[in-house]
A protein has these predicted regions:
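Structural signature of outer-membrane beta-barrel domains
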Residues: 1, 41-47, 99-103, 150-156, ...
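Extracellular/periplasm-exposed beta-strand and loop segments of Gram-negative cell-envelope proteins
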Residues: 2-13, 43-72, 101-114, 118-137
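Residues that define the transmembrane beta-barrel architecture of outer-membrane proteins
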Residues: 10-18, 30-32, 71-75, 130-134, ...
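Residues on the lipid-exposed face of transmembrane beta-strands in outer-membrane beta-barrel proteins
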Residues: 18-26, 38-42, 77-83, 94-100, ...
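Short loop/turn motifs that connect adjacent beta-strands in outer-membrane beta-barrel proteins
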Residues: 25-34, 85-90
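Early exported N-terminus immediately downstream of N-terminal targeting peptides
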Residues: 29-49
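Membrane-proximal helix-loop-helix units in multi-pass membrane proteins
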Residues: 83-111
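Predominantly the C-terminal beta-signal and adjacent terminal strand-loop region
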Residues: 122-178
Length: 178
């Protein structure tokens, strides 16, 4: 599958995103609030076929590559706009975020034929994985529960070295504690 950027998208088995966001909200009107904040997030993508393609490293053809993970650990800043619908019962958040990835690694686990020992290759080459990410998030919430959609504007890979790009759009459920 080809992305709008023209770069192939790696086959993603699954992924997860864990985030802790601290924000200070202000409510100047009954229908509107805004805030600023900071966050820590961890993202993991379980990939399939990237290592076998030889983009990261040339593996022997007979190597059994059974796990591939792309891991990011980020700290970032946020600007949040909140629109209250039906009083405080339902709200829509529009959030801009900017991240710096202090952890950027690609892990590959494989076994050579005739061996019972698995090998882990961990690539932390900063020139391959870009440290800055930015995007927008929209979430609809009631009480502490929110459904969100997040779009990342920036690339995760240096496309001159790794011509791939993971999904830019993600969706999920968030819990907010006040």
């Amino acid at each position: 599958m080809i992305y709008k950027t023209g770069y192939p998208r790696p086959s993603t088995d699954y992924g997860f995103d864990f985030e802790v966001l601290f924000k200070q909200m202000f409510k100047p009107a009954s229908w509107y609030g805004f805030g600023v904040g900071g966050h820590f997030s961890a993202q993991t993508y379980s990939l399939h076929g990237v290592a076998a393609s030889g983009i990261i490293k040339q593996y022997p053809e007979n190597a059994d590559i059974y796990k591939e993970f792309l891991n990011y650990g980020n700290i970032g800043i946020d600007i949040v706009n909140r629109f209250y619908l039906y009083g405080d019962a339902l709200y829509l958040d529009l959030r801009l975020f900017g991240d710096w990835a202090f952890i950027r690694e690609f892990d590959v686990k494989y076994v050579m034929p005739g061996s019972a020992v698995s090998t882990l290759d961990r690539f932390k080459d900063g020139s391959r994985f870009l440290p800055f990410q930015a995007g927008v998030e929209a979430s609809l919430g009631s009480g502490s529960l929110q459904i969100y959609f997040r779009y990342r504007f920036t690339n995760m890979f240096n496309h001159s070295l790794i011509p791939l790009e993971p999904e830019r759009l993600s969706a999920g459920i968030k819990l907010e504690f006040n």
